[in-house]
């Protein structure tokens, strides 16, 4: 009996370790390869021996990053991502408010459509958007570019934000809103003092997801981008090997992501400790 339990625990632990390895091993390889230097053509060098004994003649991938002509695609991606966030999040919040006050059948229908949009393949969404722009935007002798990219990103980002914000809004105690209005607060003041602080964690999560999805998107962007270049389109345009600067840029993004996760974890820990201290003070005062 004891051996059977030990075997089950070992299998569970092994499965957990295998999953972690499959998730994080590619990221570790990217970080290691970024220190290998680069070839004469600026491509990556897949020789892990160079990590411990780097070739002094090999140019660092991070130096290639400074020489690469990706500043404009990076700026374009950041601008597109920020505008997408600025437009998508308010639309999702207003939609969530409308769903909260709507009838149940309409509520389920709209939320189901949002979930269906998330399950739709990107290539289908991209083709449908191209057909839409071909019969509207292009018919006015306008070109594919920033407008079509941003419009497309907003169209697939709003469902992400809605799915993250609406479940949190459903749990909001409406008595708090009624009490705020009884105290003389206007609906706008109630929103900023009651609703917004309550929804803030979900809104921040939605902002991160929307920006990351917009920044990373290639399939839809490639169909509606016209002559505008983004980081994703630049990375997918490689034909003769992966450039070293791309690996260096990926390593920087990995480190930034790790730092962001650590900051969020630290913030949650500090909030938890603060609540514990308040509880102790209340217990002592009572």
Curated annotation (Swiss-Prot):
Mind listing the UniProt keywords for this protein, alphabetically? Cell membrane, Membrane, Transmembrane, Transmembrane helix, Transport
UniProt-annotated location(s): Cell membrane
Domain (ABC transmembrane type-1): give its ranges.
74-264
Keyword Transport listed? The answer is: yes
Q: Which SUPFAM superfamilies match?
A: MetI-like
Q: Which residues cross the membrane?
A: 15-35, 78-98, 113-133, 145-165, 191-211, 244-264
What's this protein's family per the entry? Belongs to the binding-protein-dependent transport system permease family. CysTW subfamily.
User: What is the protein named?
Assistant: Spermidine/putrescine transport system permease protein PotC homolog
What organism is the protein native to? Mycoplasma pneumoniae (strain ATCC 29342 / M129 / Subtype 1) (Mycoplasmoides pneumoniae)
